[in-house]
């Protein structure tokens, strides 16, 4: 388990770093408006494609009923249908960012497909393979994005090369690994009945994931509508600490998921609770480190990395660092709940979070702008953490 943790730790640090550097490239070589366009596209697409991802990696780890081809066929079909509806919807609305939204949707589509091989690696505790696949995808994405964007200053063209990176890593790396190590030949299986079963099984988790992303996006949408893409760009750049932290915590929690599932099935309550405490401690430790760093070095780091206008808003980073502390601990408690197979709990917590986000977004953001958005996220995540703890204590 220690080796697996090390592989995933390195892979997720690399993944988070590459995503951060892509944002940094846009900030340094582009404009706050470009940052706003990119983040607006993420805000629009993330809830939709997180829902349609069906949280398939976690389901593969905890469910033995379906084959890899049934999983990937369901994911592919649902994502293509969703992409078509997104294109029609955005076109009808006449959104000027249609192209950016569609390209980001394509990235999400292929990332969802990659979740199937990731789930297979994880189920078999072959996290070295998962780490290599993630590493190749993220490094290739960063290199191609930097080259294209630095020469063209065309955001959409650079994003297209992220799509190419994702297709390459799946078609060449993942398919080869699955064939070599598991004798799995992926192909499309047109079984509508199975699609329906998988979709119904995963709805609670998928709904929870989509709500989680929507909860993150609502303050950004309100901010953009009231203050414009420039302000959204400033906030989204600073708030990227939450994206990176959440990505890191979600990925690391996947290392513990098979072990937690086994302990729960074997009714080893003491070991189950001990591992849960260890995970929550990791979340608290990382969260406290982010708070301390933002307090003492936040302004200097923001100014150095992004520019003076970002450093002047260090208070936003400090407030969001407390939010990150709550998010990380909540993610690990949520993983513990998923390991029990009680998928319906997570969407209840997401609904509670949505209610809080909506209230505070409309109370605080119009009056306090960036500060209001940061407070909205942090207060709501604290409520979510309390909710996770309440449901966790009712597991056994």
Curated annotation (Swiss-Prot):
GO terms for cellular component: plasma membrane. It comes from the Bacteria. Its main location: membrane. The chain crosses the membrane at residues 7-27, 41-61, 74-94, 101-121, 129-149, 153-173, 198-218, 232-252, 279-299, 315-335, 351-371, 372-392. It is a multi-pass membrane protein. GO terms for biological process: capsule polysaccharide biosynthetic process. It is found in: Cell membrane. Keywords: Capsule biogenesis/degradation, Cell membrane, Exopolysaccharide synthesis, Membrane, Transmembrane, Transmembrane helix. Pathway: Capsule biogenesis; capsule polysaccharide biosynthesis. Required for the biosynthesis of type 1 capsular polysaccharide. PANTHER family: O-ANTIGEN TRANSPORTER-RELATED, PST FAMILY PREDICTED COLANIC ACID TRANSPORTER. Belongs to the polysaccharide synthase family. This is Capsular polysaccharide biosynthesis protein CapF. It comes from Staphylococcus aureus.
């Amino acid at each position: 388990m220690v080796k697996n943790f090390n592989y995933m730790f390195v892979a997720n640090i690399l993944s988070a770093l590459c995503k951060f550097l892509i944002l940094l490239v846009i900030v340094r070589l582009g404009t706050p408006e470009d940052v706003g366009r990119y983040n607006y596209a993420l805000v629009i697409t993330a809830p939709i494609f997180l829902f349609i991802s069906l949280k398939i990696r976690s389901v593969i780890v905890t469910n033995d009923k379906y084959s890899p081809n049934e999983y990937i066929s369901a994911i592919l079909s649902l994502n293509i249908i969703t992409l078509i509806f997104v294109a029609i919807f955005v076109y009808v609305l006449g959104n000027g960012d249609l192209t950016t939204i569609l390209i980001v949707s394509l990235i999400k589509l292929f990332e969802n497909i990659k979740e199937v091989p990731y789930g297979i690696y994880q189920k078999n505790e072959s996290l070295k393979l998962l780490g290599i696949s993630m590493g190749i995808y993220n490094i290739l994405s960063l290199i191609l994005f930097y080259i294209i964007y630095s020469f063209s200053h065309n955001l959409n063209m650079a994003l297209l090369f992220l799509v190419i990176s994702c297709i390459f890593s799946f078609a060449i790396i993942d398919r080869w690994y699955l064939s070599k190590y598991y004798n799995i030949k992926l192909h499309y299986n047109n079984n509508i009945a199975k699609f329906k079963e998988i979709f119904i099984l995963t709805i609670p988790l998928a709904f929870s994931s989509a709500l989680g992303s929507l909860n993150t996006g609502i303050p950004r949408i309100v901010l953009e509508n009231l203050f414009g893409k420039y302000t959204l760009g400033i906030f989204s750049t600073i708030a990227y600490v939450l994206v990176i932290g959440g990505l890191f915590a979600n990925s690391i929690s996947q290392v513990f998921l098979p072990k937690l599932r086994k302990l729960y099935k074997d009714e080893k309550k003491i070991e189950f609770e001990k591992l849960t405490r260890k995970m929550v401690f990791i979340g608290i430790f990382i969260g406290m480190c982010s708070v301390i760093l933002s307090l003492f070095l936040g302004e200097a780091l923001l100014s150095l990395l992004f520019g003076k206008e970002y450093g002047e808003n260090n208070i936003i980073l400090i407030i969001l660092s407390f939010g990150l502390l709550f998010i990380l601990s909540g993610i690990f408690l949520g993983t513990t709940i998923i390991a029990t197979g009680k998928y319906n709990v997570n969407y209840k917590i997401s609904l509670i979070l949505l209610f809080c986000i909506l209230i505070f977004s409309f109370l605080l953001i119009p009056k306090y702008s960036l500060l209001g958005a940061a407070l909205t996220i942090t207060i709501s995540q604290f409520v979510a953490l309390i909710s996770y703890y309440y449901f966790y204590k009712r597991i056994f």
